[in-house]
């Protein structure tokens, strides 16, 4: 199971950078629900393109949550891949310093925070889905906000 997944992931670097560029180039301050939800929409488009089952869990004040599940075997111990879609950067930061790569390093709002982790989690889900899943379910939980919605995840089960 592992070798084809690793080979496929190794071939996805350009696609990973493209998804990262898309996510970084969206202003998604914690208090900008529309922007955070736009990051979520880009991720759900990725899940749709890769035929990964997912659902959006609406939250009123901050960004909605997204749950994507890749099943496979009959294991009953889910493996959680999680990350938040917001950044601390104010709306307008993307215009000042959009995603760029220089000397092999990525720059832009969120590249040193969770946005690369969102890309990694999305591609891990895609890889396992493509190759038949994992013995235990893989659950991707993409929350709207790291700090301000801490009571809200109780509603996500």
Give names to the regions the model predicted.
Residues 2-109, 129-136:
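Acidic/His- and Gly-rich active-site-bordering loop/insert found
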Residues 31, 113, 147:
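Glycine-/small-residue-rich active-site loops that bind phosphorylated ligands and cofactors
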Residues 85, 142-147:
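Acidic, glycine-rich active-site loops and adjacent beta-strand->loop/helix elements
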Residues 110-125:
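Active-site alpha-helical elements of protease catalytic centers
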Residues 124-131, 152:
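Active-site catalytic microenvironments for nucleophilic, acid-base chemistry
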Residues 148-157:
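Single conserved hydrophobic/aromatic residue that forms the stacking wall/gate
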């Amino acid at each position: 199971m592992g070798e084809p997944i690793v080979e496929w992931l190794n071939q996805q670097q350009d696609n990973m950078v493209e998804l990262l560029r898309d996510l970084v180039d969206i202003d998604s301050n914690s208090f900008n629900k529309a922007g955070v939800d736009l990051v979520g929409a880009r991720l759900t488009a990725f899940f749709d393109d890769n035929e990964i089952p997912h659902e959006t869990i609406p939250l009123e004040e901050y960004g909605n949550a997204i749950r994507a599940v890749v099943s496979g075997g009959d294991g009953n111990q889910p493996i959680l891949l999680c990350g938040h879609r917001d950044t601390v950067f104010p709306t307008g930061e993307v215009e000042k310093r959009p995603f760029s790569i220089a000397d092999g390093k990525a720059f832009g709002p969120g590249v040193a925070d969770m946005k690369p982790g969102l890309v990694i989690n999305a591609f891990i889900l895609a890889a396992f889905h493509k190759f038949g899943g994992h013995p235990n379910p893989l659950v991707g939980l993409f929350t709207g906000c790291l700090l301000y919605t801490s009571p809200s995840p109780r509603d996500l089960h």
